[in-house]
């Protein structure tokens, strides 16, 4: 629907459309929508998201009532990430999400943009210039095994966070210091790192979420490192608790291992880019930090 047609429809219905960046407090309505959709949000994630680009979280309003959300967060002068594409249940099918996207995407200007899109939206994103690169599987399982903390794994602390951030940039292809500086610390949040003589060779984070725990990111240079970090993360989780993992299909061995443990894929997304894809070492990603911001 064009903006002119959409505006005409709103006028015919005596409705007024506005959109603007939301404050952290105003964004809480989006968290409520996401929880209702079973997104299993990481507790404390929102505050860390706003550390990156507090002007990148948009709400659309009809007659001053919030009806839609989109985030377009500028990580660097060259790269942005889009997420939180949501429309309030009673306002769907009216073009509000698409209209808000037009408004919000002005924020990223000429930057390349990444997103994890649901399959039903893939064609719409393609019309906007996005290209599909690979899939990400949302896997969920109940942690029922006794796991002992392995040797050779260190906590992520203020003393080594800079090394972790540099490793993350090597893997993802773009700097995320604003996101990661507090990602592994705080109530219910844990981060672990493995070093070799040449520096960091693996990182994992795990945090409380609305439905249990979310694990991510998980990056590793080899299978042995992956196994140790995964075990260390699970050692933080009480038995009988749900664990959620967003795993790119670039490492099918990791995904198949999860399924053997009883994890089930409940949906998948498409990682899409408009413009240049960041040039990292994505084949070393077992789990991303979040679908919402990459």
Curated annotation (Swiss-Prot):
Q: Which residue intervals define the domain N-acetyltransferase in the entry?
A: 17-146
For the keyword Lipid metabolism, the answer is no
Judged by the first EC level, this protein's enzyme class is transferase
Query: Taxonomically, which superkingdom?
Result: Bacteria
Provide this UniProt record's keywords sorted from A to Z.
Acyltransferase, Antibiotic resistance, Plasmid, Transferase
User: What is the reaction catalyzed?
Assistant: marinoloyl-CoA C + holothin = thiomarinol C + CoA; pseudomonoyl-CoA C + holothin = pseudomonic acid C--holothin + CoA
Its EC number(s): 2.3.1.-
UniProt xrefs under PROSITE patterns: GNAT
User: GO annotations under biological process?
Assistant: response to antibiotic
CDD domains on file: NAT_SF (cd04301)
Pathways per UniProt: Antibiotic biosynthesis
Query: InterPro entries given for it?
Result: Acyl/Acetyltrans_Enzymes, Acyl_CoA_acyltransferase, GNAT_dom, YitH/HolE_GNAT
GO MF term (any one): acyltransferase activity, transferring groups other than amino-acyl groups
The protein's job, in short, is: Acyltransferase that catalyzes the formation of pseudomonic acid C-holothin (PAC-holothin), a thiomarinol analog, from pseudomonoyl-CoA C (PAC-CoA) and holothin. Accepts linear CoA substrates of different lengths, including propionyl-, hexanoyl-, octanoyl-, oleoyl- and dodecanoyl-CoA, readily converting all into the corresponding acyl-holothin adducts. In vivo, is probably involved in the biosynthesis of thiomarinol, a naturally occurring double-headed antibiotic.
Record's protein name: Holothin acyltransferase
Question: Which source organism does the UniProt entry give?
Answer: Pseudoalteromonas sp. (strain SANK 73390)
């Amino acid at each position: 629907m064009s903006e002119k047609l959409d505006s005409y429809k709103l006028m015919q219905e005596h409705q007024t459309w506005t959109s603007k960046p939301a404050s952290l407090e105003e964004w809480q309505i989006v968290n409520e929508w996401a929880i209702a959709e079973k997104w299993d949000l990481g507790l404390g994630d929102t505050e860390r998201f706003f550390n990156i680009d507090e002007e990148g979280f948009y709400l659309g309003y009809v007659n001053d009532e919030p009806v839609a959300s989109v985030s377009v967060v500028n990580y660097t002068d060259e790269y942005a990430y889009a997420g939180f594409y949501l429309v309030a249940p009673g306002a769907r099918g009216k073009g509000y999400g698409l209209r808000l996207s037009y408004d919000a995407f002005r924020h990223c200007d000429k930057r390349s943009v990444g997103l994890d899109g649901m399959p039903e939206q893939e064609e719409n994103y393609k019309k906007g210039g996005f290209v599909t690169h690979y899939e990400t599987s949302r896997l969920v399982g109940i942690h029922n095994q006794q796991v002992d903390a392995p040797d050779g794994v260190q906590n992520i602390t203020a003393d080594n966070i800079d090394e972790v951030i540099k490793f993350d940039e090597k893997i993802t292809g773009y700097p995320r210091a604003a996101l990661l500086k507090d990602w592994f610390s705080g109530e219910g949040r844990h981060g672990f790192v493995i070093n070799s003589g040449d520096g960091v060779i693996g990182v994992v984070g795990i945090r409380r979420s609305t439905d249990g725990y979310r694990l991510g990111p998980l990056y590793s240079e080899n299978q042995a490192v992956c196994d140790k970090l995964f075990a260390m993360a699970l050692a933080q989780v009480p038995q009988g608790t749900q664990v959620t993992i967003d795993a790119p299909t670039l490492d099918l061995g990791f995904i198949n291992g999860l399924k053997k443990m009883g994890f089930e894929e409940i949906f998948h997304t498409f990682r899409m880019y408009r413009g240049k894809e960041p040039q990292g070492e994505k084949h070393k990603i077992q789990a991303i930090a979040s679908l919402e911001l990459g």
